[in-house]
Amino acid sequence: MAKSYLSDYIQHCMSFYIRYRNPVFNTKVDELNWNACNNALSNMSVYTKDLICELYKDASRDNVIRLAAENNMSEFDMWKLLRAIEKRIAKERGLI
């Protein structure tokens, strides 16, 4: 199944968030995107945050399978986590 525009947008937001932990924002949109990611992840455990960041470094199917195996999770649960955080960030950003 093809990725939705929303998934691509959240991937872009998370890539920026992961790359710049203490960012200097060039635009208001960059700031809104970074803050949405930060707020969505703020009340999660360090383990879950790290796992999500590792997922978004390379959200390919192979990476999802690898991380699921390394963390004793099913591939289904890993995809479920990815969809849940995507929805959470989209809500924080006001996209849905």
Go through the PLM ranges and name each one.
Residues 1-43, 66, 70-71, 93-96:
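N-terminal interaction/assembly modules
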Residues 32, 46-50, 80:
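Short amphipathic alpha-helical segments
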Residues 43-62:
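Short amphipathic alpha helix immediately N-terminal
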Residues 78-92:
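DNA major-groove recognition helices of helix-turn-helix
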Residues 58-74:
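Helix-turn-helix DNA-binding module
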